[in-house]
UniProtKB/Swiss-Prot annotation:
It comes from Saccharomyces cerevisiae (strain ATCC 204508 / S288c). It is an enzyme of class 2 (transferase). InterPro entries: Aur1/Ipt1, IPC_Synthase-Related, P_Acid_Pase_2/haloperoxi_sf, P_Acid_Pase_2/haloperoxidase. This is Inositol phosphorylceramide synthase catalytic subunit AUR1. Present with 4170 molecules/cell in log phase SD medium. It catalyses: an N-(2R-hydroxy-very-long-chain fatty acyl)-(R)-4-hydroxysphingoid base + a 1,2-diacyl-sn-glycero-3-phospho-(1D-myo-inositol) = a 1D-myo-inositol-1-phospho-N-[(R)-2-hydroxy-very-long-chain fatty acyl]-(R)-4-hydroxysphingoid base + a 1,2-diacyl-sn-glycerol. The chain crosses the membrane at residues 42-62, 65-85, 88-108, 156-176, 179-199, 246-266, 269-289, 292-312. Component of the inositol phosphorylceramide synthase complex composed of at least AUR1 and KEI1. Residues 374-401 are annotated as: Disordered. The modification Phosphoserine is found at residues 392, 395. Catalytic component of the inositol phosphorylceramide synthase which catalyzes the addition of a phosphorylinositol group onto ceramide to form inositol phosphorylceramide, an essential step in sphingolipid biosynthesis. The gene is AUR1. It is found in: Golgi apparatus, Golgi stack membrane. The keyword DNA damage does not apply. The keyword Repressor does not apply.
Amino acid sequence: MANPFSRWFLSERPPNCHVADLETSLDPHQTLLKVQKYKPALSDWVHYIFLGSIMLFVFITNPAPWIFKILFYCFLGTLFIIPATSQFFFNALPILTWVALYFTSSYFPDDRRPPITVKVLPAVETILYGDNLSDILATSTNSFLDILAWLPYGLFHFGAPFVVAAILFVFGPPTVLQGYAFAFGYMNLFGVIMQNVFPAAPPWYKILYGLQSANYDMHGSPGGLARIDKLLGINMYTTAFSNSSVIFGAFPSLHSGCATMEALFFCYCFPKLKPLFIAYVCWLWWSTMYLTHHYFVDLMAGSVLSYVIFQYTKYTHLPIVDTSLFCRWSYTSIEKYDISKSDPLAADSNDIESVPLSNLELDFDLNMTDEPSVSPSLFDGSTSVSRSSATSITSLGVKRA
């Protein structure tokens, strides 16, 4: 009798198909052989050099003891070289790089950081949308709305990436999880870089300090999440946000970026549920403004960043989804997008411009001077009758016979 896993997930698996199989070997020699045969493209060189440079920067900048940093990097190297673990952790390199840079950001010297902007975001918000949407949404608060905003912002945001990864791994096509790790990691990595290059105060700062200048010695604030701490009798969010690694990281909103990226991947793999995923993103947008953690312009920037990275990932990394298949073990092959075929401006053999002139039928054009005109003309004498309207003939001064 088949076990539940085989009955549910392997029943559609084609015989002798190993597309969805996982690597179970613990022999590092196999990884070394793959590396020797690997021929990286230009994009691969850029990818690894960029991430490697940031990891080296973190290694030098982070104030942790050198022995701990060396041991940590050796541990990562071990995970990368063992086949059973490298298939997950090696593809998660953008995520690991983002996490390393994020937790190192608080140790950057203040004299080398750019000044914190306090007035730009509320000014842009007013110019684009006519008012400060965060202030409007946060004007009226109650316990029900607090809980409703806390769920996506304070709970789902931290657990959703793992849930989405698990669902994509089981019900998406093989290798889709690699694309998700690539896109999710790069979106957050670019977001943290932008937050460090362009530090901006969130709405809660304006509520507490007005428009006075900010400095890096200030502590963060949980904003509306302080009401959740009070409601639940805890001090979790107050402590976490007061000591955040990137206190002035309002722009772009990585809460919005993460929710948008998760929704984009779910819409890609499960298009029938697209309204549900869009509703989740809108729910999180509202919660971030209600809890005074972001302006609407921050949310738009985070979503645009996610969309751009997703589109690049879609055409360079993601497999094509077959919505008629149940799970990863139902696939018989992995197909990816061909950018040249998807380009609407690319030359096509079916285009009329691509057909040689020798293959065109030119009999009509060649015989135009030898045969009388089929269409009546004004200058064919009394036998010609114009096919245009009577008004146009009259305007030429020609009377009908």
